[in-house]
Amino acid sequence: MKTTAAVLFEAGKPFELMELDLDGPGPGEVLVKYTAAGLCHSDLHLTDGDLPPRFPIVGGHEGSGVIEEVGAGVTRVKPGDHVVCSFIPNCGTCRYCCTGRQNLCDMGATILEGCMPDGSFRFHSQGTDFGAMCMLGTFAERATVSQHSVVKVDDWLPLETAVLVGCGVPSGWGTAVNAGNLRAGDTAVIYGVGGLGINAVQGATAAGCKYVVVVDPVAFKRETALKFGATHAFADAASAAAKVDELTWGQGADAALILVGTVDDEVVSAATAVIGKGGTVVITGLADPAKLTVHVSGTDLTLHEKTIKGSLFGSCNPQYDIVRLLRLYDAGQLMLDELVTTTYNLEQVNQGYQDLRDGKNIRGVIVH
């Protein structure tokens, strides 16, 4: 079959729309007709060269849609089911899935290669194999993916909104609730309140934090964060640190969450300094893997028992937490509709990312 997709051929170039050949589902695979795709900053790391994938690759790793066809042996979904895609597949049988760390599933090893777990590809054109970002390629009308990459959701939920819980919402919310282990009465500092960080605000608020202090240079994002539950907002880290010192009587924050678009050593150092004894720094944002971004005093960590840790997918369980977050939304306890700043069609994908670069969007969504 044929499908239109937004393809990246090399770093530094825009996405190109083209028609590709798409294989139908094999054993354990499903054909998804995508309804919506989120414009996440992680795809910008491909275009900027920070995360070098195998080119060419169909972009997009935040998606929702309807199952059109299933291959042999598929048990998780059936044709007609509404699904949200998880950018980390979860097999349920590897060491990490079996010990409750489904976000680290071994099937995620090829997410930048864009191939299926057996090394084969489902997108092709004129003899060339095209990868799919995170084995999903949601910047396409249709895709064939593993059944382990989709999560069935209630069919009365709007897929254009549900798409957000495939990456940005759990990554941010879980950074606060799971990785940050925030509790009632805590003080949290959040660096970067875009598509991920704004959901860390929601997570910290849901956890019962007394103070949620955000840092972002973009005024629009700071204003939005205050509407989502932040108690204080600052354009720079130094001003935020001074306020935290005042609010906590010099004790420091309980957790500092780093969700900026590109992590550097400056923000990591600021986060490590703003937490108090026994505090935790969680790094969820990405950077060029070849660059060292953690330069802190080991003595400070030892004497004050501070922790610096990373978090992938908000340390969530995709099969459980995607459904849980949508139920919170359905109950009016999680804001999703308010996250969508602008909707685009597939032809506008590059404009959507330019708007993201310009700080105009909390979250842009492509509606297929």
Swiss-Prot record:
Its EC number is 1.1.1.1. Gene3D superfamilies: Medium-chain alcohol dehydrogenases, catalytic domain, NAD(P)-binding Rossmann-like Domain. It catalyses: a primary alcohol + NAD(+) = an aldehyde + NADH + H(+); a secondary alcohol + NAD(+) = a ketone + NADH + H(+). GO terms for biological process: biological process involved in interaction with host; formaldehyde catabolic process; response to acidic pH. Zn(2+) 1 binds at C40, H61, C167. PROSITE patterns: ADH_ZINC (PS00059). It comes from the Bacteria. Its cofactor is Zn(2+). Keywords: Metal-binding, NAD, Oxidoreductase, Zinc. One of its GO terms (cellular component) is peptidoglycan-based cell wall. It is an enzyme of class 1 (oxidoreductase). Disruption phenotype: Inactivation of the mymA operon causes altered cell wall structure, reduced contents and altered composition of mycolic acids along with the accumulation of saturated C24 and C26 fatty acids, and enhanced susceptibility to antibiotics, detergents and acidic pH. Also impairs ability to survive in macrophages. Belongs to the zinc-containing alcohol dehydrogenase family. Required for maintaining the appropriate mycolic acid composition and permeability of the envelope on its exposure to acidic pH. NCBIfam families: Rxyl_3153. This is Putative alcohol dehydrogenase D. It comes from Mycobacterium tuberculosis (strain ATCC 25618 / H37Rv).
